[in-house]
Amino acid sequence: MGERPCILAIDQGTTSSRAIVFDAAASVLAVAQTEFPQHYPADGWVEHDPEDIWRSTLEVSRQALQAAEAKGARVVAIGVTNQRETTLIWDRRTGRPIHNAIVWQDRRTAADCAALAADGNETMVQARSGLLLDPYFSATKAAWLLDHVSGARMRAENGHLAFGTVDSFLLWRLTGGRVHATDATNASRTNLFNIHTQDWDPELLRLFRVPAALLPEVKDSADSFGQTDPALFGRPLPVLGLVGDQQGATIGQCCFEPGTIKSTYGTGCFVVVNTGATPVPSRHRLLTTIAYRIDGRTDYALEGSIFIAGAAVQWLRDGLGIVRTAAETEALAAGLPDNGGVYMVPAFTGLGAPHWDAAARGTLTGLTRASGRAHLARAALEASCYQTCDLLAAMREDGATPAALRVDGGMVANGWMVQFLADLLDLPVDRPVVMETTALGAAYLAGRKAGLYGDFAEFTRVWRRDRRFDPAMPTSTRTALLAGWQDAVRRTRSGAPD
């Protein structure tokens, strides 16, 4: 029997790096994962050491590759998916970053964004990039690096530095510094890319003061991105797919038709609805973004971004020490008859969509002497569901009419949370058999380019549902819970009275 052709999917996330090998039937053959440190040098600042990103990625890739090939598989291509917006600048000659990566959650440029908005720039920025003026995106992060690292701006203007999101940095390292490129989905998250012309926008570059010489080439999501340095894996492997993590999950959930919608629950939560070949401007402060670009065809999406989802549970574990594992929260939440009036608004780094309040900070409301660790665990889980409900309401106002929501990410292993989500949304929620949908999306792109996977219709037949969660909550209960949540959000907003 010959070796089975497979795809290595690299999933470089906010708190961990993962590598997963998929076969031609989109089944998982091998998985490797490792966490890496987070750095918080100041209030609202979040950084990663780029060498931690690279070392952890290389480590898990080698582990998964070795495990799969021990089972008779042969990896024929690599697909990469990544935490988006996180910004790096490195020296083209040495490959060394000039500073830690500034993570998507980082809010250090909030005042810069506010100043640009006060000068009347947000309408132009949104019209061209589909995004709002917010420190979430890469442009002001890049400008901050150029302004705060000694000599960086001059080196950038002289063509000695390279900018990239995490995919671009990994591609540079994987190819031994031979390829400086990104894909359209990652480019569309920078505030520098025109989603209509499909190119870097000169007016946006001027506004954010980012030299064009810094920027990578923008390619399709399924494309030839060069070959890996043979020293890394013992032989060169073609990199045939790049995609931002939420777009990767959109592909992995087979949301190829307009109106299909998915929500991913990892460090943050991201709801994405496919809008087809036409970009739909949001009237409710959602993001108009690129879902994927394949064979020159672009499909667009509306996205709502929640900065803190699973990270709230991680805080309960690592910050407060009230749970040993994230899995404990399910039994704690289920053991309560109700939430006891306790709400957590986890605005640790501000509020994302639809509020976009960079100055908001987290709150716990409704605490009494009867409140215990179970109430905190339940409040952390419920918070992701309430925020999803806010996003779905905005999407419906913008014309989306979802029949069901497909969910993925580490949090959705928690059946209690997914049922609460269905109840709160009053909408069926589908959980897939293959939970690694982000990595699966990257694998599909590389596998499609390699000839291992077929078109959208063929790949859609591979998707299988593990369980459907149907809503069962009385309307009166839902209404009361949502009213309590909205009151908690009002107390959290930066303009709220003391």
From Swiss-Prot:
Glycerol binds at R84, E85, Y136, D245, Q246. It is an enzyme of class 2 (transferase). Keywords: ATP-binding, Glycerol metabolism, Kinase, Nucleotide-binding, Transferase. Sn-glycerol 3-phosphate binds at T14, R84, E85, Y136, D245. Its EC number is 2.7.1.30. It holds the Pfam family FGGY_N. GO terms for molecular function: ATP binding; glycerol kinase activity. Pathway: Polyol metabolism; glycerol degradation via glycerol kinase pathway; sn-glycerol 3-phosphate from glycerol: step 1/1. Inhibited by fructose 1,6-bisphosphate (FBP). GO terms for cellular component: cytosol. Belongs to the FGGY kinase family. PANTHER family: GLYCEROL KINASE, SUGAR KINASE. This is Glycerol kinase. It comes from Rhodospirillum centenum (strain ATCC 51521 / SW). The lineage of its organism: Bacteria, Pseudomonadati, Pseudomonadota, Alphaproteobacteria, Rhodospirillales. The gene is glpK.
